Amino acid sequence: MPFFSYRATEAYLTGNKAAAKAFSLGAHRLNARVQELHRQAGQRIFDSRNTTIHPSTNSSNDHMVDLHGLHPTEAVEMLETTVGKLKRTGFKGRMVVVTGTGHHSRGQKAKVLPAIREYLHRVGLRAQEGTMSDGRGGMFTIQI
């Protein structure tokens, strides 16, 4: 993308507006493709960690969703989609949302956890923060 953007700027500054437009459109197309590939990768990661969204196959009234490995925006989108699917199926119960604590993130700082906390607050889902068996935190429990 920087190549196309650089070339678009260069062409514009030299007065070649047609080339500038072509390079700019190329940059936009490439950016859209990159975004789509990121979305697909996030979906694959989510699907590999969450094999079912059908609470009826779960004998208890609990449902777990694991958001490890996702970027914060992807994690919020996946949680929003999952909550919507569960509500549409009439699910009533406890949902455990695993975010992790950032131990595998750059700087060892949680990124998904605060994004999910903010999302839950914004949409009015009351959540209780908890911890997994390792005692590190990185989990929310919400009632649906």
Regions found by a protein language model. Name each.
Residues 1-144:
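Long, charged, low-complexity intrinsically disordered regions
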